[in-house]
């Protein structure tokens, strides 16, 4: 069993006189870039990330199985322009299962593998101010079968 949890708190910090130069050479106040003012998170930074991996290895029979859960809290996907709010994305909870079995015969081996990804088939969602949908779609689940023969 392996797991990790990362909690962060991020913010954008700028001074009253901080500016940036746009592609036309104009000086623009940093304060005008953030509709939420100083109380805004870094773009792409989740406050909480968690991963759990439960694995099983049977060395005598050449079998491995792993169950994986990945969680990422909501985060700023894109900054709002002028008075528009930031686009906040809610990444889906991802649950995967991976199994492999290696069969030995004389000097050869056959490895069979099965991967089941995104078992919950949750949808990806991003919105402005929780009401204007920016992106919404299902990621879809996937199944992979693998065969590897060594001689």
Which residues make up each language-model segment?
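C-terminal beta-signal and adjacent terminal beta-strands/loops
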Residues: 60, 70-79, 101-151
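Gram-negative outer-membrane beta-barrel transporters
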Residues: 1-79
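Extracellular loop and loop/strand-boundary signature of outer-membrane beta-barrel proteins
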Residues: 35-41, 82-87, 130-135
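Membrane-embedded beta-strands of outer-membrane beta-barrel proteins
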Residues: 52-54, 65, 97-99, 145-147
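Residues that define the transmembrane beta-barrel architecture of outer-membrane proteins
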Residues: 46-50, 91-95, 139-143
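Short, well-ordered coil↔helix boundary/capping segments
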Residues: 86-94, 104
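Solvent-exposed, flexible loop/coil residues
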Residues: 16-18, 46, 91, 123-124, ...
